[in-house]
């Protein structure tokens, strides 16, 4: 799993973003609280990170209560990264 986090950091995600994305791949949809526990990061940091990932369109949020989050597929993330490099 550390290799995956390092790979995500190489494509531009910071440490928290990589941990949150990996946690979401393991369990989705998930709440911010669940993600903070899975990623082993502070809950407040999880919500900040989820917002940043949502703004980058790497994570989508629901319009439910509680809000749940879903990651984009890894293939889509890879495709976006390749497009970014070639442009």
Predicted features, each with a name:
Residues 17-24:
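Short alpha-helical "packing" element that flanks the helix-turn-helix/winged-helix DNA-binding module
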């Amino acid at each position: 799993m550390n290799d995956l986090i390092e790979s995500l950091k190489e494509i531009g995600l910071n440490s928290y973003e990589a941990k949150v994305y990996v946690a979401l791949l393991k369990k989705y949809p998930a709440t911010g609280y669940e993600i903070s526990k899975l990623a082993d990061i502070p809950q407040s940091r999880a919500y900040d990170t989820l917002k940043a990932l949502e703004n980058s369109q790497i994570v989508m949020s629901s319009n439910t209560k509680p809000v749940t989050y879903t990651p984009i597929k890894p293939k889509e993330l890879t495709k976006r990264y390749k497009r970014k490099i070639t442009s």
